Amino acid sequence: MTPPRLFWVWLLVAGTQGVNDGDMRLADGGATNQGRVEIFYRGQWGTVCDNLWDLTDASVVCRALGFENATQALGRAAFGQGSGPIMLDEVQCTGTEASLADCKSLGWLKSNCRHERDAGVVCTNETRSTHTLDLSRELSEALGQIFDSQRGCDLSISVNVQGEDALGFCGHTVILTANLEAQALWKEPGSNVTMSVDAECVPMVRDLLRYFYSRRIDITLSSVKCFHKLASAYGARQLQGYCATLFAILLPQDPSFHMPLDLYAYAVATGDALLEKLCLQFLAWNFEALTQAEAWPSVPTDLLQLLLPRSDLAVPSELALLKAVDTWWGERASHEEVEGLVEKIRFPMMLPEELFELQFNLSLYWSHEALFQKKTLQALEFHTVPFQLLARYKGLNLTEDTYKPRIYTSPTWSAFVTDSSWSARKSQLVYQSRRGPLVKYSSDYFQAPSDYRYYPYQSFQTPQHPSFLFQDKRVSWSLVYLPTIQSCWNYGFSCSSDELPVLGLTKSGGSDRTIAYENKALMLCEGLFVADVTDFEGWKAAIPSALDTNSSKSTSSFPCPAGHFNGFRTVIRPFYLTNSSGVD
């Protein structure tokens, strides 16, 4: 009788229970000390490619499995070809790691290998002479339970909010003195300690004190600021540093943008320059989403004054940016503050018809009419007068930011492709605007010769330059996602294995020695936020690792929880090369 389907599912699950990512085993070796190296990751076993495989790497495997060392590091599927995915490639260990997962490599599931390159090892027959029973993992919870009991204490801890007691705990000096993170509680003599805490952080104090015992703590988007604040105030340097690393992970998790704004305000108040810089970068790259978010009306004026001068502001267009400021304005800012913001708008980046319509579409216009007329005149000169005359008679430096584009994501200046490793041949990114309908961006795949693979490819055109003088002069572009060396060859690019995948960009037409380009590539995570922005250098743009791995590639500024980017937007950014001092 055939066992029911549920039974087989049970067998499958049972076979991987108790196995952790990075665990290793030897297969098909005919003896316990040799075989094909297999490593566990995300619920399944896979193999390791023999690229760069050496005795140091093999010894890490052998020691992890209880042997003294490795005697041979074998490749070319010496113990037969495995099945499942190639988990790791180009592994480079130092010899001290607990697992191959801790060694430098291309990262999980990133390999051009086939199973005929599976790595194997032969370990010494001798196992280690010392056998260890290690129950230390239970110690953390046991110490936490001592704190939970609130018994047998010799230290009184009062939690004070604005001069009034809010909570009380007791502690055990003998445990706390063993942890430098808790030194603020025991370095002063006496049996009484008072902690002054902001009201919003009171609910986190118990978890902080328990952390001093168990050395384990759970941190969420809503609690990270308070834990960072408490750790900073009470000298818990490891916790403080760990919270700092979480900000980049947690910032994108609040689509309302209240938390990023709150963290920015916290960074300014505490003088945390690194956190302030991180918040500004996230808000700049995701400025379009911010303007559509619930928190947009509450963005403080001083923050906008820092964001609006930036060239890395990602917005559909300069007109869209000005309209967003108009929506934000209302009655919240003074006349002088609003004028300061309008001064930072790049009017030359708006077309003449857009400039003309401002008087009919903006509530700001008539309350600041003189300023708008002045900025409009400046922009119209840029659009209608050749740059040589502007530089000669007006003394304008056309390389200033006012005359250069930001990161404009509208179809006029950008194109989108997806990652072919998970896309179908015809794909779409669907972005749900918080204030509008679904917007879909489609991406075609290049019809290559029959012996080629299909790779996401987009042909598009842009104006040669933002000036209206160039509106009839079009430049043709081709954007392609290149995941392999072969794909680079197919499309005329030279790539090395350690830089893949990359985006390739080619240009045809519109040659002008006075115009240069600073093109950008936006890494999009789950259609929800911009995780990173890279430059096109030599017509290629690097694609960072979506998550922090042991890969030699840099990690995305804001990690993508999915483990991959769902798409890439390329933005064309032309500008004049010359300035007033060099023009005849």
UniProtKB/Swiss-Prot annotation:
Listed SUPFAM superfamilies = SRCR-like (SSF56487)
Which cell locations does it reside in? Secreted; Secreted, Extracellular space, Extracellular matrix
Which cysteine pairs are covalently linked by disulfides here? 49-113, 62-123, 93-103
Q: Could you tell me which residue ranges the BACK domain spans?
A: 260-359
Q: Name one GO biological process term.
A: cell adhesion
- At the top level, the lineage of the source is Eukaryota
Which Pfam families does the UniProt entry name for this protein? Answer: BACK, SRCR
Q: Which residues are glycosylated?
A: 69, 125, 192, 361, 397, 550, 579
Where would I find the SRCR domain in this sequence?
24-124
Keyword annotations: Cell adhesion, Disulfide bond, Extracellular matrix, Glycoprotein, Secreted, Signal
Provide a GO CC annotation, any one.
Answer: extracellular space
Q: Which InterPro entries match?
A: BACK (IPR011705), BTB-POZ/Galectin-3-binding (IPR051481), BTB/POZ_dom (IPR000210), SKP1/BTB/POZ_sf (IPR011333), SRCR (IPR001190), SRCR-like_dom_sf (IPR036772)
Query: BTB domain spans which residues?
Result: 153-221
The residue range of the signal peptide is: 1-18
Give the SMART domains listed for this entry: BACK (SM00875), SR (SM00202)
Which stretches are transmembrane?
A: none
User: Function of this protein?
Assistant: Promotes integrin-mediated cell adhesion. May stimulate host defense against viruses and tumor cells.
What's the name of the protein?
A: Galectin-3-binding protein
- Organism field: Pongo abelii
